[in-house]
Curated annotation (Swiss-Prot):
Its main location: endoplasmic reticulum. The keyword Lyase does not apply. The chain crosses the membrane at residues 13-33, 48-68, 72-94, 99-116, 132-152, 172-192, 205-225, 235-255. GO terms for cellular component: endoplasmic reticulum membrane; nuclear inner membrane; nuclear membrane complex Bqt3-Bqt4. One of its GO terms (biological process) is meiotic telomere clustering. It is found in: Endoplasmic reticulum membrane; Nucleus inner membrane. The keyword Hydrolase does not apply. It comes from Schizosaccharomyces pombe (strain 972 / ATCC 24843) (Fission yeast). GO terms for molecular function: telomere-nuclear envelope anchor activity. Connects telomeres to the nuclear envelop (NE) during both vegetative growth and meiosis. This connection ensures clustering of telomeres to the spindle pole body (SPB) when cells enter meiotic prophase. It comes from the Eukaryota. This is Bouquet formation protein 3. Keywords: Cell cycle, Cell division, Chromosome partition, Endoplasmic reticulum, Meiosis, Membrane, Nucleus, Transmembrane, Transmembrane helix.
C-alpha cells in the first residue's frame, strides 16, 4: 500500500515538474522568439495588448491540465490548435515561416520538459489496434474530405461575405490549391481517424474537440480581430462543422 502511494507521489512530482518546465519554456520562447504570428494579418504590434502574451501562457497551462485530466494524446494538440494556422494562412495569407516558428516553439517546449522531467504525463488513450492499411485509408479519406469541404467553404465565405458576389469565382491566390490543402490536412485526418477508432465515446470526443478548438482559436484571436469578430467566428465555426461531419462519416464507415 505504501509502495503504491510512493509511486503515485513520485508520478505526481514528475507531472508537476513536466508541466512547470513545459509552461516556462513555452512562455519564454513565445515571449522572446515568436515573431508576432499575426503581424502579417494587418495587426500592428503596438495594437497588441501587453497582457496578450500572459493570457496565452495561462491558456496553455489550462489546456495542458485538461489534456492530462482526460488522458489525451499529443495528437489532440494538432487537431485543436493548428487549424487556426491553416485558417490564418488561407484567409489572412500569413507566411509559412511564421507558422513554422509556432511549430518549432511547441516542439522545443515539449522536448525540454520531457528530457528534464523524464515524464510523459499526457499519454495516448487506449485505442483499438487497427491495421496500417485501414488507418492509412481513413487518414487519406479524412484529409481529402476536409480539404474539399474547406475549399468549398472558402469560396462561399469569400464570395458571399467578403466580396459580396456569389457568382464570380475567387482567384486561387486567396485560397490555396487543393493539392496543398491535402498535404496540410493529412495530420488532422490522421488524428480524426484515431479519434474514431479510440475507445473514448464519440460524443465525448466531439465535445472535447469543439471545446479545445474554440479555446485555442476563437478566444485569443477574437480579441485581436475584434473589429471582424463575426467573420472569424464564421471561419472557425465552418472548420469545426467540417471536422464533425468527417468524424461522423469515418465513424459510420467503420461500423
Amino acid at each position: 500500500m505504501s509502495g503504491s502511494k510512493c509511486c503515485s507521489s513520485s508520478n505526481t512530482i514528475k507531472v508537476s515538474i513536466y508541466l512547470f518546465l513545459h509552461t516556462l519554456t513555452y512562455g519564454l520562447l513565445n515571449y522572446h522568439l515568436n515573431p508576432r504570428l499575426l503581424a502579417s494579418t494587418g495587426v500592428v504590434e503596438s495594437d497588441i495588448p501587453y497582457w496578450m502574451s500572459y493570457l496565452s501562457i495561462i491558456m496553455h497551462v489550462g489546456q495542458s491540465l485538461l489534456l492530462q485530466k482526460f488522458n489525451l494524446g499529443y495528437g489532440w494538440l494538432l487537431l485543436t490548435k493548428y487549424p487556426v494556422y491553416v485558417l490564418l494562412s488561407t484567409y489572412y495569407l500569413t507566411p509559412l515561416s511564421q507558422i513554422a516558428w509556432a511549430f518549432i516553439i511547441d516542439a522545443i517546449s515539449l522536448l525540454v520538459a520531457r528530457c528534464f522531467s523524464r515524464a510523459n504525463p499526457i499519454k495516448c488513450s487506449n485505442q483499438v489496434n487497427t491495421q496500417y492499411s485501414v488507418s492509412f485509408l481513413f487518414t487519406i479519406m479524412a484529409s481529402v474530405l476536409i480539404s474539399v469541404l474547406n475549399y468549398i467553404s472558402q469560396k462561399i465565405f469569400l464570395n458571399g461575405l467578403i466580396l459580396g458576389n456569389s457568382h464570380n469565382v475567387v482567384t486561387s491566390l486567396v485560397a490555396p490549391p487543393l493539392p496543398l490543402q491535402y498535404l496540410a490536412h493529412v495530420p488532422i485526418g490522421y488524428v480524426i481517424q484515431r479519434v474514431v477508432f479510440s475507445e473514448r465515446p464519440i460524443p465525448q470526443s466531439l465535445f472535447l474537440m469543439i471545446f479545445l478548438t474554440l479555446w485555442n482559436c476563437f478566444i485569443p484571436y477574437s480579441i485581436l480581430f475584434s473589429m471582424n469578430w463575426s467573420a472569424m467566428f464564421q471561419v472557425v465555426g465552418a472548420y469545426l462543422s467540417q471536422i464533425w461531419i468527417i468524424t461522423f462519416i469515418c465513424w459510420a464507415l467503420s461500423l
